[in-house]
UniProtKB/Swiss-Prot annotation:
Organism of origin: Bradyrhizobium sp. (strain BTAi1 / ATCC BAA-1182)
Ranges in a coiled coil: none
Family matches, as CDD domains: cupin_ARD
Role of this protein: Catalyzes 2 different reactions between oxygen and the acireductone 1,2-dihydroxy-3-keto-5-methylthiopentene (DHK-MTPene) depending upon the metal bound in the active site. Fe-containing acireductone dioxygenase (Fe-ARD) produces formate and 2-keto-4-methylthiobutyrate (KMTB), the alpha-ketoacid precursor of methionine in the methionine recycle pathway. Ni-containing acireductone dioxygenase (Ni-ARD) produces methylthiopropionate, carbon monoxide and formate, and does not lie on the methionine recycle pathway.
Pfam families per UniProt: ARD (PF03079)
EC number in record: 1.13.11.54, 1.13.11.53
Protein name: Acireductone dioxygenase
Required cofactor(s): Fe(2+); Ni(2+)
Entry keyword set: Amino-acid biosynthesis, Dioxygenase, Iron, Metal-binding, Methionine biosynthesis, Nickel, Oxidoreductase
Site feature location: Important to generate the dianion: R105
Alphabetical list of Gene3D superfamilies matching this protein: Jelly Rolls (2.60.120.10)
Site (May play a role in transmitting local conformational changes): D102
Binding site for Fe(2+): H97, H99, E103, H141
Length: 183
């Protein structure tokens, strides 16, 4: 389920807010300059659909965001349980970093959590299938798909190189609860 948990940055055991009310989440996220939306596919996506079929199913929404925000390219990333590359990728995504462009992810399937580090708070934003999450450029953050990640995401970019992180060197993410997929 879509969820927002707000922590004190200096005291990860102190939860300031925990909610799964989408309207509350959308308001809090917008106040941070971030974005969350719910999308529906224009037509069903079959299991094992190609990347092109996935992108086509959400073409209307993707085109709208491209017009609004200047995104020039996108791709599909799929991580399934047992992926031998996930531990290395997870280690990289768990390091606090920033981007020179917004980090835009739409969850086609599965779930994952972005952690936004702003001032004296950390906002854990859990997205699920149907959620579009956008972290503004320059915002310190990290991502976790859990120990056995299971998600398919559409990613949108303005940078032709795709995902380029600038790591802060701050180990703050080590102090916060890792994301665990609810059973």
């Amino acid at each position: 389920m879509t969820q927002l948990i707000v922590y004190e940055a200096g005291n990860p055991s102190h939860v300031l807010l925990q909610t799964s009310d989408f309207d509350v989440i959308a308001g809090k996220v917008a106040a941070l300059g971030a974005r969350i939306e719910r999308w529906e596919a224009r037509h069903p996506i079959a299991p094992g659909a190609s990347n092109e079929e996935v992108l086509s199913a959400y073409g209307h929404e993707i085109d709208r965001l491209k017009r609004e925000r200047g995104y020039t390219n996108g791709d599909v990333v799929r991580i399934k349980p047992g992926n031998p590359n996930w531990p290395e990728l997870r280690g990289k995504f768990l390091q606090e970093h920033v981007h020179v462009e917004d980090e835009v992810r739409f969850f086609v399937e599965g779930t994952g959590a972005f952690y936004l580090h702003l001032d004296d708070k950390v906002y854990q934003l859990v997205g699920e299938a149907g959620d579009l999450l956008s972290v503004p450029h320059g915002v310190k953050h990290w991502f976790d798909g859990g120990p056995e990640a299971d998600f398919t995401c559409i990613r949108l970019f303005t940078n032709q190189e795709g995902w380029v992180a600038h790591f802060t060197g701050d180990a703050i993410s080590d102090a916060f609860p890792k994301y665990e997929i609810a059973a």
